[in-house]
């Protein structure tokens, strides 16, 4: 009996020791497939942002082109025909918005902050180019858009900005990107090729893309009168200067993967 009691006491003691030593359970493990805002690296965020920006672009093209096709029907139609009488299904018009804001834009401030701290200037440049591209896509589709308070700091109630604010902001992002691509990376930073699935880490291709987008966006201001693009005016001289530094052949193209 004494032996039996001793065995029980030993078992209880062992269990108490086991559980007291495991108060944090498996907190020591970090799941590389599910990074958090705190431990996600700037290079991993870039690949994620590129994927979602690419998807937002595809959905924008798909939704708009299919809608146009359904609008040509005389009666009835598929999923998108209801858009012709202004009664669209929610998913038909919000998917590009969701993929851009929820998948890409929300990650950009974190990438810029971490890359800046690490002096990974080329990552900052890529993030700025994508930010300009994504928000210009959104304002082309939807008009006025949450811009200045639309990302991580906005929460669930972002405010809307007008087209001029968005245009000038996107052009400023491209100017910043061009500056960043011309800076020398910090000695301990990850190569741009580690996280870049669009240009394979080619800074030259990123620069050409930035100049091309800048020329394209300034050209859209043709009805705003001649002047400086910095003031939201049509700036023909700047367009031509940017085109001289943009892609000159297919070998210079950015490929969205």
PLM region spans:
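Short secondary-structure junctions and interdomain/linker hinges
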Residues: 14, 56-60, 253
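Short, solvent-exposed coil/turn linker segments
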Residues: 3, 30-32, 162
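Generic surface-pattern signal
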Residues: 9, 51-58, 113, 186, ...
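Residue-level marker of intrinsically disordered, low-complexity segments enriched
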Residues: 6, 10, 26-28, 246, ...
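Short, mixed-charge, low-aromatic patches
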Residues: 6, 58-68, 124-133, 192
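Structured, solvent-exposed acidic/aromatic patches
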Residues: 39-43, 74-257
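Sec-dependent bacterial lipoprotein signal peptides
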Residues: 1-20
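Membrane-proximal, proline-rich intrinsically disordered regions
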Residues: 22-73, 87
């Amino acid at each position: 009996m004494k032996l039996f009691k001793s065995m029980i006491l030993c078992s209880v003691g062992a269990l108490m020791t086991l559980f007291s030593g495991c108060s944090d359970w498996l907190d020591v493990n970090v799941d590389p497939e599910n990074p958090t805002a705190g431990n996600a690296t700037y290079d991993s965020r870039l690949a994620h942002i590129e994927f979602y920006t690419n998807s937002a672009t595809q959905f924008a093209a798909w939704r708009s082109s299919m809608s146009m096709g359904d609008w040509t029907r005389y009666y009835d139609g598929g999923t998108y025909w209801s858009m012709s009488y202004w009664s669209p299904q929610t998913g038909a018009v919000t998917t590009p918005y969701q993929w851009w804001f929820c998948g890409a834009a929300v990650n950009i401030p974190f990438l810029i902050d971490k890359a800046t701290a690490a002096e990974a200037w080329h990552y900052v440049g890529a993030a700025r180019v994508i930010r300009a591209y994504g928000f210009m896509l959104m304002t082309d589709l939807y008009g006025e858009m949450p811009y200045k308070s639309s990302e991580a700091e906005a929460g669930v109630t972002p405010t809307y900005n007008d087209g001029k604010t968005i245009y000038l902001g996107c052009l400023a992002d491209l100017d910043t990107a061009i500056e960043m691509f011309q800076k020398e990376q910090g000695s301990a930073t990850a190569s741009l090729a580690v996280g870049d699935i669009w240009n394979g880490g080619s800074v030259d291709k990123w620069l050409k893309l930035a100049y091309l987008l800048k020329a394209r966006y300034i050209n859209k201001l043709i009805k705003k009168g001649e002047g400086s693009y910095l003031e939201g005016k049509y700036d023909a001289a700047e367009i031509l200067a940017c085109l001289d530094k943009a892609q000159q052949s297919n070998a210079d193209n950015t490929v969205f993967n």
